[in-house]
Amino acid sequence: MKRLVLICISVIFLMFNAATNGRLSAQQTFIERLTAHNRMMSAKQPVFISPLVGADPRLIQYAKLSVAHQYTSTGTETVNYGNGRGAGIIVGDRFEFDFVPPPYIQHNSAADDGFGDAAVSAKFRVASANKEGGNYDVAFILGHCFATGSHKNGASTDSFGPTLAAGYAFHRFDVISSVGAILPTGKIGTQGRSIAWNTVSQAHIRPHIWFEIENNASFFAGGTHDGKMQNFMTPAAFYIVRGKSWKATHPTFIVDGGMQIATSGFHTYNHNLITELRMLF
């Protein structure tokens, strides 16, 4: 697994160098080329902020630290350190590659604590335009989750996760929607398959402040949840940290948080408090 991750990272960086060396100054350092390429891609896209839960159709370069606190109806708290978040890098004009390290899961119950599954994904920008060209973005994402979890803290087998995401911005508001699936590579009878449909409305109310409300729906086919559906409403807030000396060449830090609130009769947990620290570069 470690060797595979190192190979993937090496290939991505080689692709990035090949894609950017022809357009950016050879006198720039790798970090300067990295940030300059990100600015070039951002100029082709609308101004969104990545949803707390749902997929982002834009190509972005980022690193995220995320912690989730899930609470069941009996009051049991499960803490997920990592929460399926990691880092991403833009390669060329149309691709983003992401790596999600295994999260650490603390159950606060009789279940064994341990590490969950690692994952990778590739995002392809189908079409996009900034506010001068239509203010929209459409992307296809293909993820692969590796069954690396310990003590049953992950899936029984690997799985693929295709997702279609799109967004449209209008003045200080935008709407983002995505539809995706989790398709295990084996043991379908026990694991089942699922479809996730996320819809997000965002408002950029102040230069440093965004608010959003998400609807997170999951539909299950096969497995222990066969035929069931769960839904969460997720309000969230984002604060962009930029000092007076901030420049476009500097990284941007974002502090954000929100709460998933169960609104369906069936749900695997009642509430999920999510907090994050993001760095965009």
Put a short name on every predicted segment.
Residues 22-281:
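Transmembrane beta-barrel domains of Gram-negative outer membranes and organellar outer membranes
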Residues 1-34:
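Cleavable N-terminal export/targeting peptides
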